[in-house]
Amino acid sequence: PKFKAEGGYSKVAESVFVAALFTYAGPNFVGILNHLGKKNDAAKAQAEIDKMKKVIMESAWDGNWFMRAYDANGQKMGSHECEEGQIFIEPQGFAIMSDIDKDATKKTLAAIDERLNTKHGLVLNNPAFSKYYIQYGEISTYPGGYKENAGIFTHNNAWIICAAAYAGEGNQAFKYYSEIAPAYTEETSDIHKTEPYVYGQISGGKDAGSYICQTGKNFGQGKYSWLTGT
């Protein structure tokens, strides 16, 4: 269905992030059902989890990482085929911790390190959006390097730290932890600027400052201290 700027969205859009959350949380639900003696329900739930894993690999695996979504036009979001926003952080960690595919896990961790990691933490997406996309809405309204447009969200950095540790990549996990943990960022307080003893919601991504034609000027600068689920 054709996307309409007015009159609402179609029901075509699908979130790969939510699909990965389903496969991640599902086994806990299966465990509860088994504990309650509801074996038939547990088997049905497990079948749906296995089905979702297969669908994710068939429809959302981009070759080196997991896509972010299909938009309201049914077009790929978070794919190497996209002009901007080719890779997003959100689905990666939960797809890894869901054991969807071992080979995919290795490739995803490598892509995260190559495409998302910076000395101040993992950016939410890369490349940043440089213009407004009506099908994406709010995320493409922020300047590059801020908030959901390639900012460094400490909250979802934690998901990748957990995923790397889960996959047995302890050194990679600790590297990411060290990039955002207050105990390890004291030396960059002059850049970070927020209280050095607390997490903030975001830090400026590598593109921060592009809105004043000084890309990188505010890279690593903290924002919204205390306000985070990290």
Regions from the language model: what does each represent?
Residues F3-A19, G74-S98, I139-N157, C162, ...:
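Solvent-exposed loop and edge beta-strand segments that line ligand/cofactor-binding
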Residues L21-Y136, Y177-F219:
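Catalytic cores of carbohydrate-active enzymes
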Residues K106, G229-T230:
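A glycine-rich beta-turn/hairpin centered on an aromatic-Pro dipeptide
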Residues H155-N156, N171-A173, S189, V198:
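Active-site-proximal binding-pocket segments
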Residues C162-T185:
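Catalytic-core region of carbohydrate-active enzymes that cleave or remodel glycosidic bonds
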